[in-house]
Design a protein with these regions (language model features):
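Short beta-strand edge/turn micro-motifs at domain boundaries
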Residues: 132-162
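A mature extracytoplasmic/lumenal domain signature
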Residues: 71, 114-118, 152
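A short gly/proline-enriched turn/hairpin at secondary-structure junctions
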Residues: 60, 66-76, 87-92
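Short, low-complexity N-terminal intrinsically disordered segments enriched in polar/charged residues
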Residues: 21-63, 162-168
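Hydrophobic pocket/interface hotspot
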Residues: 45, 57-58, 65, 77, ...
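Surface-exposed, charged secondary-structure patches
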Residues: 83-125
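Beta-strand elements of well-folded, non-transmembrane domains
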Residues: 50, 118-122, 139, 156
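Bacterial N-terminal signal peptides that target proteins for export
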Residues: 2-16
Length: 168
């Protein structure tokens, strides 16, 4: 009956759909950027540990963080975390491999779940220690930076040696 009006409605609906899609792609892109940013944060932990940089490692945690490592009592607060790692870091040549399974950001909270493989060769004895499992790092945004609020790892039967890259 009104062909010209129908064309405008169709054109309007098409434009609205394009605008909605463009906003969706911006949101997906922003989420991907945050996930990449969080993946980089996860890599910092392994880098500082491998380099025996205790001070660098401590910069990654909030003051009231909790660390719960398999086979160890939970550590509450930065002082306990520092004390624990100070007796271990730098005592062995350590190499980590990480396989991120999930990275998500929700406002000022983010988390990473990853498979990990650790190979540590004692600097004095040459004895090799291997560990593999799954970890959960929960991050809080603090003063514009992502900081670890919870660091949990566990042994798990579906993550075992050798590491996928061939690290052995």
């Amino acid at each position: 009956m009104f062909p010209r009006l129908t064309r405008f409605r169709t054109l309007g609906a098409f434009c609205a759909a394009l605008m909605a899609l463009s906003m969706l792609s911006v949101a997906v892109s922003a989420q991907t950027d945050f996930e990449t940013e969080i993946a980089v944060e996860g890599g910092k932990w392994a880098k500082y540990y491998e380099q025996a940089d205790l001070e660098g490692l401590m910069t990654l945690y909030v003051d009231d963080a909790i660390v719960a490592l398999h086979g160890q009592p939970a550590l509450f607060g930065i002082a306990a975390i520092r004390e624990y790692f100070s007796t271990r870091i730098g005592k062995a040549e350590s190499v980590f491999e990480l396989d991120y399974e999930l990275r998500e950001t929700h406002g000022d909270i983010a988390y990473i779940i990853s498979k990990y493989w650790l190979k540590a060769t004692d600097n004095e004895t040459g004895v090799v220690y291997k560990d593999a499992g799954r970890s959960l790092l929960v991050y809080k945004k603090q003063d514009g930076q992502w900081k670890i609020a919870a660091d949990i790892d566990q042994a798990t039967p579906d993550v075992a040696w050798p590491a996928p890259s061939g690290l052995n």
